[in-house]
């Protein structure tokens, strides 16, 4: 699996801009068990050769995609099974940007993330966003009308308010969640702080989490036993240590926040409604 783009590595641009996420489908190829590597390379190629970005902008900004597989899906108008794919792209910049500047740049990057053939664009009933149609392998391959509709319906751009601060390395953890017996087919593999805000009471949320909506968990895998594996992330309060220096231990409050996020994530994936709030009594 590709490296986690929610962690900082040496050489990464320091300032975090936001994330682009969408869900689509690709045909199931029996000879290729894990297509995430090739799909990630296609998305990266489409972002690099995006006609809306100049060479100077490509040096000033970086976009790191993460591709994970979902469950299989069968459509009535298509022969053969297909695989649901979740794509998340994280953007960074060399200089601090305002939220409006970051949003404009993320919208430009979206136009290079898809590879839509002409016949799919012609058969699609609704108008396409400007500049999103590209012919060839430059971007995520859209091979059918329902794949394009799914990608556009689930397309989200997350730009936090505090994009002018360095993206310090935060606390990461994984959790395994049993999939519910019945749930909607088109489910995005992203869990945001907006979802936390809907689950937690306002005083509790304000005391433990920032108000900026950003991605805090993403589904990274699904095993044959109908369970999902999610990677949860929390922004760090202090910069990451330099090389060969000891790491600063995370506080007990950070570990408590990670546990709260895991509980809310489990509730969301099991389909519990707004009446189930285990933290309202605190």
From Swiss-Prot:
Record's keyword annotation contains Nucleus: no
Protein purpose: Early protein essential for viral replication. Strong and global transcriptional activator of both viral and cellular genes. Activates transcription by blocking host retinoblastoma protein (RB) and inhibiting the SUMO pathway. Inhibition of host RB leads to the activation of E2F1-dependent transcription and, in particular, of E2F1-regulated S-phase genes. Stimulation of progression from G1 to S phase allows the virus to efficiently use the cellular DNA replicating machinery to achieve viral genome replication.
Subunit structure: Interacts with host HDAC1. Interacts with host E1-activating enzyme (SAE1/UBA2 heterodimer). Interacts with host retinoblastoma protein. Seems to form a complex with host E4F1 and HDAC1. Seems to form complexes with either CUL2-elongin BC complex-RBX1 or CUL5-elongin BC complex-RBX1. Interacts with TCEB1/Elongin-C, CUL2 and CUL5 in vitro.
Chain location of the short sequence motif BC-box-like per the record: 251-260
Places the protein is found: Host nucleus
Name of this protein: Protein GAM-1
Record lineage: Viruses, Varidnaviria, Bamfordvirae, Preplasmiviricota, Tectiliviricetes
Organism name: Fowl adenovirus A serotype 1 (strain CELO / Phelps) (FAdV-1)
Domain commentary: The BC-box-like motif could mediate the interaction with host cullin RING ubiquitin ligases.
This protein's UniProt keywords: Activator, Early protein, Host nucleus, Host-virus interaction, Ubl conjugation pathway
A GO term from the CC aspect: host cell nucleus
Consequence the record notes for mutating residue 265 to A: Complete loss of binding to the elongin BC complex, CUL2 and CUL5 proteins. Complete loss of inhibition of sumoylation and antiapoptotic function
């Amino acid at each position: 699996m590709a490296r986690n783009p929610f962690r900082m590595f040496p050489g990464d641009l320091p300032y975090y801009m936001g994330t682009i996420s969408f869900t689509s489908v690709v045909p199931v190829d029996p000879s290729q068990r894990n297509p995430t590597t090739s799909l990630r390379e296609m998305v990266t190629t489409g972002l690099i050769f995006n006609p809306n970005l100049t060479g100077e902008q490509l040096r000033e900004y970086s976009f790191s995609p993460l591709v994970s597989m979902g469950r299989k899906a069968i459509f009535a108008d298509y022969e053969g099974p297909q695989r649901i794919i979740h794509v998340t792209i994280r953007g960074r910049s060399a200089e601090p940007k305002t939220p409006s500047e970051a949003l404009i740049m993320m919208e430009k990057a979206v136009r290079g993330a898809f590879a839509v053939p002409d016949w799919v664009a012609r058969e699609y009933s609704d108008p396409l966003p400007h500049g999103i149609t590209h012919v060839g392998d430059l971007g995520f391959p859209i091979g059918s009308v329902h794949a394009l509709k799914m990608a556009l319906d689930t397309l989200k751009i997350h730009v936090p308010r505090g994009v002018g601060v360095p993206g310090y390395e935060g606390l990461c953890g994984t959790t395994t969640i049993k999939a519910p017996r019945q749930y909607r087919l088109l489910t995005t593999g992203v869990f945001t702080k907006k979802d936390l805000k809907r689950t937690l009471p306002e005083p509790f949320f304000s005391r433990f989490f920032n108000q900026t909506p950003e991605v805090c968990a993403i589904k990274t895998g699904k095993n044959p036993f109908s369970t999902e594996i999610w990677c949860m992330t929390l922004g760090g309060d202090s910069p990451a240590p330099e090389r060969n220096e000891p790491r600063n231990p995370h506080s007990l409050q950070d570990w408590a926040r990670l546990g709260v996020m895991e509980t809310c994530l489990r509730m969301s994936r099991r389909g519990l409604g707004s009446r189930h709030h285990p933290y309202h009594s605190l």
